Amino acid sequence: MDAQKKFDLLSMGEILLRLSPLPNEKLARGELLEKRIGGAELNVAAGVAMLGLHTGFISKIPDNKIGDFANNTLHYYGISGDYLLRDTNKDARLGIYYYEGSAAPGKPAVVYDRRHSSALSLTSDELPDEIYRSTRAFHTTGITLALGGAIRETAVDAIRRFKEAGALVSFDVNFRANLWSEEEARESVNRILPYVDVFFCSETTARLTFGKKGDLRDMMKSFTEDYPISVVASTERIVHSPKCHTFGSVIYDAKQDAFYEEEPYRNIEIVDRIGSGDAYIAGVLYGLLGHNGDCRKALAYGNAYSAMKNTVPGDLPFCTRKEIDRIIARHHDGDGAEMDR
């Protein structure tokens, strides 16, 4: 890590409380709910921390026991809460989402209850000026922009100020139709693309939200022609059933004018797919930050981390760098041993 920087990565967004019925149970029928902490941007910070880099999270949480639960999760993963603000308002709350898993032919379902959460009131005035000089990289997503209100403008301002301070800026479009329209997403994301260095965008989003034409590689490269983006990453997931997926990705390095791709991870046994896209981003950012911008490393860590996240419950990844290195080696060498021993 740069000796002058306190963090390798700072991430900004809303922390969510996830409530889920027991496996194979329905929200409309089950009486018990399991609670976990998650959120797209937090998932990335946790993943990068698990791989050995120093991360921190920027948000606002209620000053109550639910906020304590969120804060304790950060501590467990080794994520700094230096910029995790506490909301003392009597109406302070953590956003909630309910997740119902499913087996074929059904599909998983999500219900959100996140309006008026504490995170949405976060303003730039609440953040110290030194924060922008404290990190090598900054990450946020289109979800944070989609939430609107104060946090949207705070995120836009943060992207600009982190970029001006010399940080690598990472942005994941992560389009959610239940949060905003494609037109609103396009207008908001276009505001920040001049400041983005590492851009994550799916093929579907590139076509429908940004109106891109041609094949995937043409669309990825066009983002770097329209804006000073250095790296574009796009994932591909084939859903064979709710319990069996294939996952791979493509990364474009504009400086080298080169695309990177590898054999996808096939027939992944799905325990919980939530957060697997964020784990991919964590792996890519670790590869770039930990290996001097090496896109081959970024691809390998991104694909492996995402594949493994699918195999553990909850939003947050839980794989060490040693485990991921072993998975990568097996994937590349074709080691089919049944058990480590």
Describe every region a protein language model picked out.
Residues D2-D8, R160, K213-R341:
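Conserved phosphate-binding/catalytic region of the ribokinase-like
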Residues N43-T55, Y76, G287-H291:
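Alpha-helix C-terminal capping segments
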Residues H54-G142, I324-R341:
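Conserved N-terminal subdomain of the carbohydrate kinase-like
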